[in-house]
Amino acid sequence: MAQHFLHSKESRNFAKALNRVTEDESESYLALCRWGPDNKQACPGCGVFRKHYRRKKRRRWRCAEIACRHEFSVTSGTPFHGHKLTFKEILLLIFAFTTNANGASLLQVSRRLGLTPKSVQANFGKIREVLIHGLDLTPMTGTVHVDGGHFCGKPRKPNHKIRMPKDAIAKRYGKKKPASTTKPWVEMGMTKQNYLRLAHKRVVIVFTQAGKLGEGSRRSIPIVCRRECDEYAFPLMKAFVRRDAIVMTDESGAYTGFTALGIEHHQVKHSEMFSTSEGVNDNMCETFFSRMRRAEYGTYHGYRPKYLQDYAIEHGWRDDNRRASQDELVNKLTGQIFGSGKSNWWRGYWQGNHRQGELTADWFLAKAAA
């Protein structure tokens, strides 16, 4: 049997080097990821890219342009702008984010690095924000699997099984139930608390593009929606899948009308089989949801609707880079982080600067159209 990738030496080829890294080496590595190997820097004040004056003791640079003279560090103008961490701690945080296949627990990283859980939460939130803004939304081609998975709003099992007699509702309210006294949770045979939890239920509709034979999924676009229906599925399909693609889904009614869009569409009835004899399946979506659910139960112990999209994008990134070596993951993510601007959603989070509301499908559709 072939060896799993996580058993290979490439999956751990950065850990030993990171254990011996110094503060100077950490700063040099972050500068390399941000500005390249030419020993030149881009001044955040005037934007001039050249070799600026180094202030070694303060670990900063001063702009060489006379009209500017702006002072900056390697983290200025990045998501880590105004941080109170050492450069090695920043590098260790990025490493901790990438090294776990199903995500990293805040308390586990906090104990490992000696940082407060608040600091880990805010900085991990900044990394997820970078992944959201850096998500590749170009329309998919080739074979594309589409499916929806339900998260959040999970009901809790009661201590005693609620068994409602068939005529219990009629005995209590008569033949016609008054609208003011109707209790839908009684009709559904659940507690009021569980009925209220259903309001937090969300659906993640994921589009996965197949790679070569045996390669599995190559790219994922997970979008959080209120329901799994054509109201959400059709606009997302138009925006993220090309008309010459071959789309495979399950038998859900949300996807039955895809042929009207001029797309070759095949469905598999999951009530009867996982895959048809012709090979029609949506197993790449099921693989994505399997990893995301394992993280929900085993790592994060639950998602919340407001930040469910952040976690979905994180797991999409992990799924797309599942075969990358350890140093490739760190290099790629660090370059992406230090190539972006300041954080808007997590800068000053513990001082009350919170993102308002959930990220919706309309947000991604507008971004794709821009």
Question: What would you call each of these model-derived segments?
Answer:
Residues M1-A370:
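Residue-level recognition of single "structural anchor" positions
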